[in-house]
Amino acid sequence: MTRFTTTLVAALAGANLAAAKCSYKWRAHAGDTCDSLSSDWSVQVSDFIKWNPSVGANCSNGVTAGQEYCVEDNGAGSKPTTPPTGSPTTLTTAVTTASSTPTQPTDGAPSPIQDGVAKDCKSAHSCKAWYKVQAGDTCDKIVSKYGAFSTDDFLKWNPAAGSDCTGLWVDYYVCVGVAGTPTSPTGSNPSKPSSTQAGVAKDCQKWYKVKSGDTCDKIKNQFNTFSLDDFLKWNPAAGKDCSGLWVDYFVCVGVPGTPTSPTGSDPSKPSPTQDGLTDKCTKFYKAQKGDTCQKIVDSLRTFTVSEFTSWNPAVGKDCTGIWVDYYYCIAVPGTPANPGPVRPSPVQDGITSKCNKYYKVQSGDYCDKIINKYNKAFNLEQLVSWNPAIGKDCSHLFVDFYICVGVQG
């Protein structure tokens, strides 16, 4: 053999010997070095180089990301129990390859974990708790879930998450407690629920669990004991535009000094109600599933749709803003106490709620003809006031629609 061939065979034999003796390998990640892998796996650098001849003498060839390296030989004792802290090359890889049921090493530390996790969290003797990151989690959300440590604590224990918390990886475990961490939520209020957002008022004494479809205004109106500014001050994580409410999380709806009953000039006003409701209201109605303005008007027959929307402006002119289980004004001073006769259908918008007599428009009808039909018991001005949709010039009479031709009193 030539010297070159002899050297190559010897090198390959050494590599094969190392591979044969190796009892555990680890795939290197970007940024790994001989020193970092040796440190992570608690082995001597000289042993690491001996087990991995491809790195070259004194690690002159370096470590290649994606390549497997021996981190334990079969004569060096049992397999290391703590996984290394190298980062996966991309977040996508971490999300798609992380095990749905991570293994539990013999020392109690779960796998996988991210780079730099608190030393106290790597030992079953010191770690209080671990948490497996879920899709949609944020640092604040995790902190709020436990309520036993601060965001600063969390980032100190899990520096790989980053100061802006953009480095959380789904299906990886993060440290949520070291020796000395309280086992129950902290704060001045022992009754504070566990699922709260960051920054919630420390002196909160009343809580509300957010439901799907809730908004800050909706919650405020439901209680009617505090202002929107109060709510946002007590729950800053909701954001000024209230886009940060989390379903099934608790928000603060009362601190010392907050009224225990709805505020307002009328102690008989029910709750909840929407903003802008007339202060002259004398009677209320609780909206049911499937209600519309027209349906409410037709069932009570004492006011018009235009009157209803003027008393309850939050429903909108198109009446798309009715909320189930909220109260709406259905009477003010002067509203008839008793329903009029059953209103026929169809009728045009705005017909008076005081109508007690109707006429079905026929082909060829016009206003004067209808007035004469009733022996001039009313005039054009009255007919238009009872049926504003027909227009002042009476150009919008609809055949087969009913119009009002008589009112109460």
Curated annotation (Swiss-Prot):
Residue segments, region Disordered: 74-111
Location in the cell: Secreted; Secreted, Cell wall
Knockout consequences: Lead to relative tolerance against H(2)O(2)-induced oxidative stress. Impaired fungal virulence in both injection and topical infection bioassays using the last instar larvae of the wax moth Galleria mellonella. Impairs fungal propagations and ability in suppressing immune responses in insects.
GO MF terms, alphabetically ordered: chitin binding
Ranges of residues in domain LysM: 24-71, 129-176, 206-253, 283-330, 357-405
Cellular component aspect of the GO annotation: extracellular region
Record keywords, A-Z: Cell wall, Chitin-binding, Glycoprotein, Repeat, Secreted, Signal, Virulence
Function: Secreted effector that enables the plant pathogenic fungus to manipulate host defenses for successful infection. Required for the full virulence to infect insect hosts. In contrast to Blys5, Blys2 is not able to protect fungal hyphae against the hydrolytic activity of chitinase but plays an important role in evasion of insect immunities. Binds chitin. Coats and protects the cell walls of insect pathogens from host cell recognition.
Additional notes on this entry: In plants, chitin acts as a microbe-associated molecular pattern (MAMP) that is recognized by lysin motif (LysM)-containing plant cell surface-localized pattern recognition receptors (PRRs) that activate a plethora of downstream immune responses.
Protein name (database record): Secreted LysM effector Blys2
Organism from which the protein derives: Beauveria bassiana (strain ARSEF 2860)
Source species taxonomy: Eukaryota, Fungi, Dikarya, Ascomycota, Pezizomycotina
Gene: Blys2
